[in-house]
Design a protein with these regions (language model features):
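Catalytic cores of nucleic-acid endonucleases
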Residues: 41, 48-99
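Domain-level recognition of nuclease-like catalytic cores that cleave nucleotide substrates
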Residues: 77-127
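Short, solvent-exposed coil/turn elements at secondary-structure transition points
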Residues: 19, 49, 116-118
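Amphipathic, interaction-prone secondary-structure segments
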Residues: 18-21, 26-31
Length: 127
């Protein structure tokens, strides 16, 4: 569903790409690197939560790592997406709203979106 939407929107992509080091020193692999028609690169991390579990607890750390990657990319990335899919999220509204703003800083370049919203934006070519 995601990949056809990206193609429809004019994006090319690479899957499972290491974009640098995570906070703490391990490799930071994102699910996708999109390339726009204008040549901009956009990292995308996708999290699926079918039932309540640990993926939910990893969201703040992933946002921090994506923000760090954008900041250290020397202009290669101007933004990144964290896509949340599935019905098992108890904190989805908190993450999609402004819940993290009082706890995290410097993550303005990271857009946290529902899977459906990401697909709609991809289809329209407006990521």
């Amino acid at each position: 569903m995601v990949l056809p939407a990206l193609e429809q929107g004019g994006y090319t992509y690479e899957k499972q790409v290491v974009i640098g080091k995570r906070l703490g020193g391990r490799n930071h692999k994102v699910d996708l690197i999109l390339t726009t028609r204008q040549g901009r690169k956009i990292p995308v991390s996708m999290k699926w939560q079918q039932v309540s579990g640990t993926a939910e607890q990893k969201v703040p750390f992933e946002i921090m790592c994506l923000a760090d990657a954008v900041a250290k990319s020397e202009g290669k990335f101007s933004k990144a997406y964290l896509v949340l899919g599935g019905d098992g999220w108890t904190l989805k509204d908190f993450y999609l709203g402004d819940g993290l703003k009082q706890y995290l800083k410097n993550f303005e370049a990271i857009e946290v979106v529902k899977l459906e919203a990401f697909i709609a934006k991809a289809n329209k070519g407006i990521l």
